[in-house]
């Protein structure tokens, strides 16, 4: 068996046999890894609580036939430590972990940008400088962008017409169409497209670009509308819902 080292975030764990667990990790160099931690469920396990979700760990592993084996684990930063006592932040963090796993469907395919986004998002949740819903939506939008699915917010997703003010009949990009890829002009607007408020679109752009001054000043109604659009857009492109999003408490 080949020995290798990596660091990453623990995404989830599941029981294996009477004393072991399968640990899913998003690694810096290895991408998403599924590895066995032997004896981790025993009271006197040498791993202790080092392999819990949200934890940034430094690992030594042996390659196995189907699952690798964790031989050593050291905590770099326990991002989950401040979260259980804060339900909105905890549920936002769980949604981040699930999303990161969905965006890395192929095992051992490098996904450094996704890992760095996840680390940044978990750090922001722990620091509590911004509302957890904003941190989550920023993470979701940027994850979509890394995967090549950034929504068009400043030009029509279909014809490319720019959002450069208003026409005689209103905004040039009055609608958001999930299947089209973002904002659309009146000519390209499909049936059933949403009509978000202008501040909602501005908030989405701020979260995507990292303009936290603008995002923090946003009103709750625009945050709620933004979250709904982001969730719908995410589900469309993943072709699968993020189950934990339904438990996120928006504030």
Name these PLM-found stretches.
Residues 1-251:
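Non-catalytic alpha-helical scaffolds and adjoining flexible linkers that form interface surfaces
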């Amino acid at each position: 068996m080949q020995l290798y080292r990596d660091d990453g975030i623990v995404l989830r764990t599941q029981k294996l046999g009477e004393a072991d667990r399968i640990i899913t990790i998003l690694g810096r160099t290895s991408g998403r890894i599924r590895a066995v931690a032997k004896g981790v469920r025993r009271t006197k396990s040498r791993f202790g609580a080092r392999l819990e979700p949200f934890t940034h760990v430094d690992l030594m592993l042996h390659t196995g036939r189907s699952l690798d084996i964790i031989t050593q684990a050291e905590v770099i930063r326990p991002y989950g430590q401040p979260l259980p006592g804060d339900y909105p932040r905890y549920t936002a963090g769980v949604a981040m972990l699930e999303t990161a796993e969905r965006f890395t469907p192929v095992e051992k395919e490098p996904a450094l940008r996704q890992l760095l986004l996840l680390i940044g998002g978990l750090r922001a949740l722990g620091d509590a400088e911004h509302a957890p819903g904003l941190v989550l939506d920023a993470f979701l939008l940027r994850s979509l962008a890394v995967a090549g699915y950034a929504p068009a917010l400043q030009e029509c997703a279909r014809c490319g017409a720019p959002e450069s003010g208003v026409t005689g009949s209103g905004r040039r990009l009055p609608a958001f169409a999930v299947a089209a890829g973002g904002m659309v002009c009146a000519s390209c607007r499909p049936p059933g497209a949403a009509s978000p408020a202008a501040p909602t679109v501005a908030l989405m752009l701020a979260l995507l670009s990292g303009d936290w001054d603008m995002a923090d000043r946003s009103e709750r109604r625009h945050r709620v509308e933004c979250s709904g659009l982001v969730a719908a857009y995410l589900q469309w492109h993943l072709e699968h819902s993020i189950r934990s999003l339904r438990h996120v408490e928006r504030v």
